[in-house]
């Protein structure tokens, strides 16, 4: 924005534009150029120029009668203007802001991010040279890291000696090894051995273990001999019984209690009982309670046994009727 001193027309144009913007005029007085008002301009605009109520002439400025605006003064804005211009605004007597290497719009953080490093313990704080302050006072100079928000930040009143003490304590604690980790380390060392050494180490151990087994096992006691003899006798008897049952199964027995496969029938009824129940079933498939009690007394069975037998007999009859019906249908069909 600064213009050379050799062009007074441009300098006078800029001064008039500043004056008209500060007074709130929307148009420039000598030309038809539009200038925005102070409310339309941003934070770095000429809002700080609302401070020139007594500027009547172009080259005369009374610095004692200037009133400071309510807006905060930024020292960086003064560097934009021409240093030889008579309209240069004097900087108020305020504590000087630190010269930042980053733009003024960036919010300077009060603390900086601290990272653990081995270099911090080695550095001597007295040997640090005095450099101009580019960051906040709370940030240590030996840590050139950029402050990052969202991470752990050191307390403002935290001295450097405490951090050195903590680092020293960390070194001591790292040298001390807990007892619980000794077993793991020994296992890792054993596993890291080559396979040949492992085999060599295992062979003498195996020989010692076998020797111990032979030494510890004396002559067998008489009780153990008796138990083994009884177990052998039981095994031989069970084998004989299995052979007998197999022979019985092989020889077909025409008994009404055994089925064709050789297994015993589930029905515990005798031949006389089944004949009496069959007669009653042919006469009547469904029994009343009184008739069921009479049959149970005559056949020497319980009421529940008679009831179950009749239920099973009805299911059997139903199955037989279904099979005969299917057989008749299949025989009547002609396959072409």
UniProtKB/Swiss-Prot annotation:
Superkingdom of source: Eukaryota
Localization (cell): Nucleus
Recorded GO CC terms: nucleus
Assigned keywords, A-Z: Developmental protein, DNA-binding, Homeobox, Nucleus, Transcription, Transcription regulation
Family affiliation: Belongs to the Abd-B homeobox family.
GO molecular function: DNA-binding transcription factor activity, RNA polymerase II-specific; RNA polymerase II cis-regulatory region sequence-specific DNA binding
Protein name, per record: Homeobox protein Hox-D10
Cited Pfam families: Homeodomain
Protein's UniProt keywords contain Transmembrane helix: no
DNA-binding region: 262-321
Protein's job: Sequence-specific transcription factor which is part of a developmental regulatory system that provides cells with specific positional identities on the anterior-posterior axis.
Region (Disordered): 193-217
Main location: nucleus
Organism: Heterodontus francisci (Horn shark)
Record's keyword annotation contains DNA-binding: yes
């Amino acid at each position: 924005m600064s213009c050379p001193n050799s062009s007074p027309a441009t300098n006078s144009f800029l001064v008039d534009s500043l004056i008209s913007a500060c007074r709130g005029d929307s148009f420039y007085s000598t030309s038809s150029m539009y200038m925005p008002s102070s409310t339309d301009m941003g934070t770095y605009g000429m809002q700080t120029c609302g401070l020139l109520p007594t500027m009547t002439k172009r080259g005369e400025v009374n610095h004692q009668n200037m009133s400071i605006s309510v807006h905060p003064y930024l020292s960086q804005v003064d560097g934009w203007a021409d240093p030889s211009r008579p309209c240069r605004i004097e900087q108020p007597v305020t504590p000087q802001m630190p010269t930042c290497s980053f733009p003024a719009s960036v919010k300077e953080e009060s603390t900086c991010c601290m990272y653990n490093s081995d270099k911090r313990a080695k550095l001597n704080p007295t040997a640090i040279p005095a450099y101009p302050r580019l960051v906040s006072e709370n940030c240590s100079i030996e840590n050139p890291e950029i402050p990052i928000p969202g991470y752990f930040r050191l307390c403002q009143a935290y001295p450097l000696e405490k951090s050195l003490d903590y680092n020293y304590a960390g070194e001591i604690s790292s040298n001390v090894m807990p007892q619980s980790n000794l077993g793991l380390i020994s296992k890792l060392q054993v596993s890291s051995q080559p396979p040949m050494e492992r085999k060599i180490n295992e062979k003498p151990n195996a020989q010692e273990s076998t020797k111990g087994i032979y030494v510890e096992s004396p002559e067998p006691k008489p009780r153990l001999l008796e138990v083994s003899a009884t177990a052998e006798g039981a095994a031989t008897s069970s084998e004989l019984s299995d052979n007998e049952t197999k022979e019985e199964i092989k020889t077909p027995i025409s008994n009404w209690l055994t089925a064709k496969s050789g297994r015993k029938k589930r029905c515990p009824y005798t031949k006389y009982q089944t004949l009496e129940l069959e007669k009653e079933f042919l006469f009547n498939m469904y029994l009343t309670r009184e008739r069921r009690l009479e049959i149970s007394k005559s056949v020497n069975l319980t009421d529940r046994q008679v009831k179950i037998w009749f239920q099973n007999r009805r299911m059997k009859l139903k199955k037989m009727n279904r099979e005969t019906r299917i057989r008749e249908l299949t025989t009547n069909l002609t396959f072409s």
